[in-house]
A protein has these predicted regions:
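His/Asp/Glu-rich metal-coordinating catalytic cores
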Residues: 1-55, 64, 71-252, 258-267
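Hydrophobic beta-strand segments of well-ordered beta-sheets in folded domains
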Residues: 52-54, 78-79, 205, 273-274, ...
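Short gly/pro/ser/thr-enriched loop/turn and capping motifs at secondary-structure boundaries
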Residues: 86-88, 213, 281-283, 371-374
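A short helix-to-beta-strand connector/capping loop
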Residues: 127-134, 147-150, 270, 313-316, ...
Length: 406
């Protein structure tokens, strides 16, 4: 048995590990690095066509975003994941491919004027579709034999809908060794989804440590703190713009805002509008609504039993088209705008930053981890001026939701 760590061994994003055991070669995750780190993920030391399969811990792009490239380069094995992860990846990989194609087209238009060589997208929609076709979805807690001497099981880890730790039993020369890959571990008492499952035994554990250098305090009052931010900003006549991961964090925010509205924690602004301005987030929210309730926690199921949708409320609006997105910034009413991408590297959020970042009455609210060299990280580290669409924009109106960056 041999393990080679290919990503996320010196940075947070770009998770990928090669397991060679029982005559098989499997990748655990195949993620895209977020931002322009000084490090680059190492090349996979075997040809993609020689890899037997991939085990995906969850759907976030830093764990699955290079799967279409793997397929483009010759991978033809199976991709194993939980059923919700497989469904979420079907929208997330298409979206990632669209971004790759759009950015390549933009660079080529810009480079044409300077005589630069044309660039190709890292991968295309066609590559993403080919990767999606290789997914095989499984239930939690079900043992799956990948090959003689190689058995896995997905266990709920409470990070994201469908997220898992993966238990792997390797039998070689009559001896069995148990490995556990933690995946990204969720917080206790996270809304909607269940708390992480505790595993009792393993010979080797490979564990994420995004926040391994600190101790978390008591559970913050996310609803109360968010309500105060909304109240202060609306009272100034501003918007609250939230760069948010389309899958997971957006649905958590909807859960919190539903409670804020239900308890009337923001006063004087009526049924204030909340926009989801991300086609991917809209699709992900649909998947959440259609998911088997057994994936949800007791609180979410109690709401469902009463006929209450945990992530639906009066004033919630969705923006699908570009025209609908642009219209948001012509409306003077104070509002919440939730848009992707969560690290501000792409997507419609960059347009909303252009329109709101310089306005002192507005708040740009960060609610997730910001990788090194991303625009979001630059803002959190105190950047006072940023470039957006070739324009220099003064940065005066950003903050973060305390302790909600995991």
């Amino acid at each position: 048995m041999k393990l080679t760590f290919l990503g996320a061994n010196h940075e947070v994003t770009g998770s990928c590990t090669l397991l060679e055991a029982a005559g098989q070669r499997f990748l655990i995750d195949c993620g895209m690095e977020q931002g322009k780190d000084v490090y680059e993920n190492q090349p996979i030391p075997v040809a993609p066509g020689e890899i037997d399969g991939v085990l995906a811990t969850h759907a976030h792009i830093d764990h699955t975003g290079l799967l279409p490239l793997l397929v483009r380069n010759g991978f033809r094995g199976r991709i194993y994941a939980t059923k919700p992860t497989a469904e979420l990846c079907s929208i997330m990989l298409r979206d990632s491919a669209h971004i790759q194609e759009f950015e390549a087209e933009w660079k080529n238009r810009k480079g044409q004027r300077s005589g630069a060589e044309p660039v190709e997208p890292m991968y295309t929609i066609q590559d993403a579709e080919a990767a999606i076709a290789l997914f095989r979805g499984f239930d939690y807690n079900k043992e799956v034999e990948l090959a003689p001497g190689l058995v896995i099981r997905f266990v709920d880890v409470g990070h994201l809908l469908g997220s898992s730790s993966i238990e792997i039993w390797v039998t070689e020369n009559g001896a069995t060794t148990k490995l556990v890959f933690s995946g990204d571990i969720g917080n206790l008492h996270q809304p909607i989804i269940k708390d992480p499952t505790y595993l009792k035994d393993a010979d080797y554990v490979f564990m994420e440590s995004t926040y391994g250098d600190r101790c978390h305090g008591p559970k913050p009052d996310y609803v109360g703190e968010l309500a105060k931010i909304l109240q202060r900003t609306f009272d100034r006549g501003g918007n609250v713009v939230i760069p948010s991961f389309a899958v997971g964090r957006t649905q958590e925010l909807l859960y919190f805002i539903r409670e804020i509205k239900e308890k009337n924690l923001v006063t004087g602004h009526g049924c204030f509008p909340v926009y989801i301005d991300s086609p991917l987030a809209i699709e992900a929210t649909r998947i959440f609504k259609d998911t088997d309730p057994s994936c949800f926690d007791e609180e979410a199921n109690a709401l469902l039993a009463k006929g209450i949708d945990p992530i639906q409320f009066p004033g919630l609006k969705v923006s699908v088209t570009s025209d609908e997105s642009r219209a948001i910034n012509t409306d003077p009413v104070p509002k919440v705008i939730i848009s992707a991408s969560g690290m501000c590297e792409a997507g419609r959020i960059r347009h909303h930053l252009k329109h709101n970042l310089w306005r002192k009455e507005c708040t740009i609210l960060f609610v997730g981890y910001q990788a090194v060299s991303t625009l979001g990280r630059s803002l959190l580290e105190g950047a006072t001026n940023v470039k957006l669409f070739g324009e220099s924009i003064e940065a005066v109106s950003y903050t973060h939701l305390r302790a909600h960056e995991t």
